[in-house]
Amino acid sequence: MERNHNPDNCNVLNFFFADKKNKRRNFGQIVSDVGRICYSVSLSLGEPTTMGRNNLTRPSEFILLGLSSRPEDQKPLFAVFLPIYLITVIGNLLIILAIRSDTRLQTPMYFFLSILSFVDICYVTVIIPKMLVNFLSETKTISYSECLTQMYFFLAFGNTDSYLLAAMAIDRYVAICNPFHYITIMSHRCCVLLLVLSFCIPHFHSLLHILLTNQLIFCASNVIHHFFCDDQPVLKLSCSSHFVKEITVMTEGLAVIMTPFSCIIISYLRILITVLKIPSAAGKRKAFSTCGSHLTVVTLFYGSISYLYFQPLSNYTVKDQIATIIYTVLTPMLNPFIYSLRNKDMKQGLAKLMHRMKCQ
């Protein structure tokens, strides 16, 4: 019985099992050919349909719709967010100056608080000034490069905040659970190491996200339904496959955020166990009072972030802007008040600073 030969099968077999006369390819050439085939397949998986290719582009600019698209809302919103920005910058700047000018505040806890205040100033400066300009502008545009730059520093400073909060939790753990070894453990070298990690890890994280975002191909629409270039709203404009990007957000991003959060949880569990062993009620109150401000900031910061980012891209809606405002605008503004109102040393330091400024 004669076998039917499929020409396509023969071609594939001949590619790998050619006779000696035609088999001039070495192993490296075969690997190269297979690599080109795999690369072509991967590109085809990431490409949109032929119908949509004509609408693909890398836009020169985006349009930020902001908090409201109604013209009559723009000036009232400007009147609301300008004072918020000024209060945030001035409040955090006063915290920094008070800590630097008072020798009693030259401790690891206040060192990290001063750095947190500096990062909060940078954090809101990345977002609010551009938002204020757009409130008074008719175009509300942001260039492609400016958008990626804003996204980079937003992610970097936001994650730096979380790592600094973790460093402050570790400081409180050592102060309460190991008070006799506090100076030795929380040395200048340890504080600098925690500070370097708090800056380096978030910046590597941001760089990875920006590189992945820059590989995306966008559709004809360049309208971002948000008040700044956040990761999720920009992803929604992409026509190319952003599966890798979305998986990275949900895995690597989760790891970057959960690492400091885990440090905070473990530190406070150890603190709770230690405080419950204190016999006097006054001692328990004193121990908890040193952690109250930090816990309030952690709750505000991580509560809004977990609600916003740990959800699929398809579930992201305009309503999530409220959660974004909490951790991008309100939390940096409230930090100086939270850390100073219930902190006797901080209030005294601020009072001394204000007295010096009046005398000058």
UniProtKB/Swiss-Prot annotation:
UniProt-recorded Gene Ontology molecular function terms: G protein-coupled receptor activity; olfactory receptor activity
Residues in compartment: Extracellular: 1-75, 130-150, 209-246, 310-321
GO terms under cellular component: plasma membrane
Electron transport found in the keyword field: no
Subcellular location: Cell membrane
Disulfide bond annotation, renumbered to this chain: C147-C239
Residue ranges of the TM segments: 76-99, 108-129, 151-170, 190-208, 247-269, 287-309, 322-341
Matches recorded under InterPro entries: GPCR_Rhodpsn, GPCR_Rhodpsn_7TM, Olfact_rcpt
Cytoplasmic face of the membrane: 100-107, 171-189, 270-286, 342-360
Membrane topology per record: Multi-pass membrane protein
Glycosites: N55, N315
Keywords: Cell membrane, Disulfide bond, G-protein coupled receptor, Glycoprotein, Membrane, Olfaction, Receptor, Sensory transduction, Transducer, Transmembrane, Transmembrane helix
Domain of life: Eukaryota
Gene3D superfamilies to which the protein is assigned, alphabetical: Rhodopsin 7-helix transmembrane proteins
Biological process terms in GO annotation: signal transduction
CDD domains referenced in this protein's UniProt entry, alphabetically: 7tmA_OR1A-like
Similarity-based family: Belongs to the G-protein coupled receptor 1 family.
Function: Odorant receptor.
PANTHER family given in the database record: OLFACTORY RECEPTOR
Full protein name: Olfactory receptor 1L1
Species annotation: Homo sapiens (Human)
